[in-house]
Regions:
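Compositionally biased terminal segments of proteins
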Residues: 1-155
Length: 155
């Protein structure tokens, strides 16, 4: 039974401490708050979850985060959210679409804690806050938005 708790394994705890020290040093060096640097690191981890999944080809990465990650230097900011448009390969009923979005959401947030934003969720759109269990939700949460009701093109 595999646990996601960093503190149950001395090696993982050591890696966690080294990572925090590195990200804190990077934060000081570039003059960006440590929470922003850590959140940006976790966004990259979440996007790696997507990239390594069967959903990589049916999700369009868009918005400011996509510009900062895919076109370095295009905008100078650290990210707080992940915006995706899901483009299914076949027509789907609302129920099937909702289930597919939930699977994408679960894939991206694997290894993280998640809190659904209920008033922003329906069959065609899912929103949630995602953060690592060893971090504060208030300082390291990432807003994950997956949907279909907006243009898939980066804006």
């Amino acid at each position: 039974n595999k646990s996601h708790n960093w503190y149950e394994n001395d090696i993982n705890y050591g890696i966690f401490i080294i990572l925090h020290q590195f990200l804190s040093a990077l934060s000081s060096y570039i003059g960006v708050p440590a929470d922003a640097v850590r959140r940006d690191y976790y966004i990259v981890q979440m996007m790696q979850n997507l990239q390594n999944s069967e959903y990589a080809e049916v999700c369009v990465f868009k918005g400011g985060t996509s510009l900062s990650k895919c076109y370095p230097g295009s905008i100078n900011r650290f990210s707080e959210d992940i915006d995706l448009t899901f483009i299914p390969v076949e027509d789907m009923t609302n129920k099937k679409y909702s289930k597919a979005l939930k699977r994408v959401e679960d894939t991206i947030s694997a290894g993280f804690l998640m809190e659904k934003i209920e008033d922003e969720r329906n069959d065609r759109n899912k929103s949630a806050f995602v953060w690592p269990e060893n971090e504060s939700k208030e300082t390291c949460r990432v807003k994950l938005e997956i949907g279909s009701s907006v243009r898939p093109d980066p804006v």
